[in-house]
């Protein structure tokens, strides 16, 4: 069976257990008016009549409550506002990715500067940077050289980054993680 993304999105909004008008199957409800005022506990038929007179919908917003809570509202407008809020929340969400910069224990000055420049670009864009050094062969016996390179890298980026995770070994790799420094002044 084929479902499009739009179908799934509509189902998630409608699937909030919000029963509308004739879908409500309870005897009495605690009723909330159009302006948010409490109208008390009313029989379902009376609540539906009030909603019909106002040309709006009766929406069951809390079916688990005793008695269930229903609100007189324009459901189309409510759904539109809900979708609008969801869209705003997705816009505000920023996706932070972790970029990796690979170094070697015997890296040359020019290569080091190039990797540093790339890492600075990533940090300025707001991404985190994982700096890793892979030890090949017998280089693993000289871990202090790798630690020195990572310390130099951290020192060179200290103006725009903070060390989120200090240098540590993981198998034949030593790595540290940098995060962009946030100035909240």
UniProtKB/Swiss-Prot annotation:
Compartments reported by the entry: Cytoplasm
Alphabetized UniProt keyword annotations: Cytoplasm, Initiation factor, Protein biosynthesis
Subcellular location, principal: cytoplasm
InterPro entries, per the entry: T_IF-3_C_sf (IPR036788), T_IF-3_N_sf (IPR036787), Translation_initiation_fac3_CS (IPR019813), Translation_initiation_fac_3 (IPR001288), Translation_initiation_fac_3_C (IPR019815), Translation_initiation_fac_3_N (IPR019814)
Single GO MF descriptor: translation initiation factor activity
Presence of keyword Protein biosynthesis: yes
Any Gene Ontology biological process: ribosome disassembly
PROSITE patterns: IF3
GO CC annotation: cytosol; membrane
Xref: NCBIfam families: infC (TIGR00168)
Function per UniProt: IF-3 binds to the 30S ribosomal subunit and shifts the equilibrium between 70S ribosomes and their 50S and 30S subunits in favor of the free subunits, thus enhancing the availability of 30S subunits on which protein synthesis initiation begins.
Family: Belongs to the IF-3 family.
HAMAP family reported in the protein's UniProt record: IF_3
Record text on subunit structure and interactions: Monomer.
Stated name of the protein: Translation initiation factor IF-3
Organism: Streptococcus pneumoniae serotype 4 (strain ATCC BAA-334 / TIGR4)
């Amino acid at each position: 069976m084929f479902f499009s993304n739009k179908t799934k999105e509509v189902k998630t909004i409608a699937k909030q257990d919000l029963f509308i008008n004739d879908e409500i199957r309870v005897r009495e409800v605690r009723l909330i008016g159009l302006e948010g005022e409490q109208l008390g506990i009313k029989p379902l038929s009376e609540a539906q009549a009030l909603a019909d007179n106002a040309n709006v919908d009766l929406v069951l917003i809390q079916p688990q409550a005793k008695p269930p809570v229903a609100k007189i509202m324009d459901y189309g407008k409510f759904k539109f506002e809900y979708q609008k809020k969801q869209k705003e929340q997705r816009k505000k969400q920023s996706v932070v990715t972790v970029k990796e910069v690979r170094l070697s224990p015997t890296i040359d000055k020019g290569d080091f500067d190039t990797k540093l420049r790339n890492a600075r670009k990533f940090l300025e864009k707001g991404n985190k940077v994982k700096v890793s050094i892979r030890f090949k062969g017998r280089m693993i016996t000289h871990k202090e050289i790798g630690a020195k390179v990572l310390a130099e890298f951290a020192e060179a980026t200290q103006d725009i980054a903070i060390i989120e995770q200090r240098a540590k070994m993981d198998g034949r790799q030593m790595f540290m993680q940098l995060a962009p420094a946030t100035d909240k002044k």
